[in-house]
């Protein structure tokens, strides 16, 4: 038995609607998710792997230096008055070298290399890098703080060594060109033959102090970032490729072959999160994204703040801070002892960097308010000084990221060193960095054309297909039953009798009789 023409059309239209439902809401998301799992893994065939190995554009690396405008008074214990100078803008190119795949456990090992180029056009107005800045002598203070902490009995000898190495300095301040202290380096004189300077310099060679480079004639060159520039980092990092499980992509497994650190307590020694250059896809808002910083030897866990967008792509904004080690049980293991923690918003970097410095948010944002009372000239502002990342949740792509960290040092107060006896003992800021990433138009368009435009087209088409298919099915059914009803109405099987209305009886109403007066009723 053949279906009527209208029902055939209705069946075809209904099939189209059903296809739209199945393809648009079931098959396409499944295909998309499967394809993304392949594309987001760090296999050699993917574009993500190429970008992961060598970011094809420069990051923004900005440095802001705090100039101490009243150094002479600070030497006598006064509150420092600071003036921020910056930004000194550098183009930072990042790549991974000595990359090796390990099929057996789905991991990759690599080392990092960063290259910095000073960009005066993008720096603050009129800044050339040749400006003289006045800051606490990081190297001198670092020596004193390290010895005071580890070998206080040797402070007297260190005092004599300082006089020889630094040529009898009048105070603990350094007056130096900005680019010299940041990258080019300043000379540390270790050519002295006196016992104290010679013994101290010998110890420096053995310790491999951060930021120190050995020069000819027994000299050292010291800078903050110089040893990082165009140098292969010695640490070997192992991360998951995500081929077997895409949710593991980029997860740090080991550093230098060790599955955990030994510098903190308990869970703070664990490697949690990715290496910060790639993240897993499909992360919901309720879940924190995690990244492990090899520079700071810790995991950061930004939390969701709000919905944002970047160049037409919807993103989720995540924010982070240093934390409160004393009152956050998850972070307390960063303290040497449970009841011995730095103030809120400070992290002791000595265990990680072998340098007696503290990390904080710029201008002591989200930190103990007491820190702001120890200096003048700071103005914390979350929009300028906060850590944030705008994250595309489907692909796990960081669209915009701003990592901002301030480095601080204690003005050591001790009677065993003449230069340090009148200092305040407070923690003061030295400089802060703003390392920024913003995907350029080329890569945003690539993401749009490969993912979001097809996704949007399918999103619109599925509604059109379902709507027109459903409408066609309804119309076909209506037409079928309408014709069926009409056929029944005119069919010979049903006889309809003609009804002739009865003519009403004609009455003569031309004469109306006179009405009689009603009878009277006596009451």
UniProtKB/Swiss-Prot annotation:
Record GO biological process: sensory perception of smell
Keywords linked to the UniProt accession: Cell membrane, Disulfide bond, Glycoprotein, Membrane, Olfaction, Pheromone, Receptor, Sensory transduction, Transmembrane, Transmembrane helix
Extracellular side of membrane: 33-458
Domain of life according to the entry: Eukaryota
Annotated membrane topology: Multi-pass membrane protein
TM helices/strands, residue ranges: 12-32, 459-479
Gene Ontology molecular function terms on file: pheromone activity; scavenger receptor activity
Pfam families hit by this protein: CD36
Functional summary from the UniProt entry: Plays an olfactory role that is not restricted to pheromone sensitivity.
Protein name (database record): Sensory neuron membrane protein 1
Organism: Heliothis virescens (Tobacco budworm moth)
Lineage per the UniProt record: Eukaryota, Metazoa, Ecdysozoa, Arthropoda, Hexapoda
């Amino acid at each position: 038995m053949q279906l009527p023409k209208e029902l055939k059309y209705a069946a075809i239209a209904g099939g189209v609607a059903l296809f739209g439902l199945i393809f648009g809401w079931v098959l396409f998301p499944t295909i998309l998710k499967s394809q993304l799992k392949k594309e987001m893994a760090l296999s050699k065939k993917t574009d993500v792997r190429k970008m992961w190995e060598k970011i094809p554009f420069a990051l923004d690396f900005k440095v802001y230096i705090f100039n101490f405008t009243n150094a002479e008074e600070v030497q006598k214990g006064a509150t420092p008055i600071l003036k921020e100078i910056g930004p000194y803008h550098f183009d930072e190119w990042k790549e991974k070298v000595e990359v090796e795949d390990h099929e057996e456990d789905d991991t990759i090992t690599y080392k990092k290399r960063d290259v910095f180029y000073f960009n005066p056009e993008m720096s603050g107005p009129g800044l050339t890098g040749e400006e003289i800045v006045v800051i606490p002598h990081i190297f001198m203070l670092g020596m004193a703080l390290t010895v005071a902490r580890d070998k206080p009995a040797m402070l007297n000898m260190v005092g004599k060594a300082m006089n020889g190495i630094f040529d009898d300095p009048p105070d603990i301040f350094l007056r130096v060109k900005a680019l010299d202290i940041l990258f080019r380096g300043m000379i540390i004189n270790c050519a002295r033959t006196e016992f104290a300077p010679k013994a101290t310099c010998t110890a420096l060679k053995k310790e491999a102090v951060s930021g120190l480079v050995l020069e000819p004639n027994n000299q050292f060159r010291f800078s903050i970032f110089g040893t990082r520039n165009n140098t292969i980092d010695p640490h070997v990092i192992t991360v998951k490729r995500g081929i077997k499980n895409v949710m593991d992509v980029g997860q740090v497994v080991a550093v230098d072959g060790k599955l955990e650190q030994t510098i903190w307590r308990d869970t703070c020694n664990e490697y949690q999160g990715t290496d910060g250059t790639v993240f897993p896809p499909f992360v919901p808002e309720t879940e924190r994204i995690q990244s492990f910083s090899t520079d700071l030897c810790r995991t950061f866990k930004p939390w969701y703040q709000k919905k944002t967008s970047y160049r037409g792509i919807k993103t989720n904004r995540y924010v982070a801070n240093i934390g409160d080690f004393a009152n956050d049980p998850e972070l307390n293991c960063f303290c040497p002892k449970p009841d011995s923690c730095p103030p809120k918003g400070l992290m002791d970097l000595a265990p990680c960097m072998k340098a007696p410095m503290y990390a904080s948010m710029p201008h002591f944002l989200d930190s103990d308010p007491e820190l702001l009372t120890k200096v003048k000239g700071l103005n914390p502002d979350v929009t300028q000084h906060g850590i944030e990342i705008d994250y595309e949740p489907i692909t796990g792509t960081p669209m915009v990221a701003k990592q901002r960290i301030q480095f601080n040092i204690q003005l050591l107060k001790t009677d065993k060193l003449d230069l340090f006896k009148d200092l305040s003992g407070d923690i003061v800021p030295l400089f802060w960095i703003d390392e920024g990433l913003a995907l350029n138009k080329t890569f945003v368009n690539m993401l749009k054309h490969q993912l979001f435009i097809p996704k949007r087209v399918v999103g619109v088409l599925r509604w059109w297909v379902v709507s027109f298919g459903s409408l066609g099915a309804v119309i076909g059914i209506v037409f079928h039953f309408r014709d069926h009803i009409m056929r029944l109405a005119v069919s010979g099987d049903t006889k309809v009798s003609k009804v002739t209305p009865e003519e009403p009886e004609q009455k003569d109403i031309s004469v109306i009789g006179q009405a009689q007066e009603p009878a009277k009723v006596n009451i």
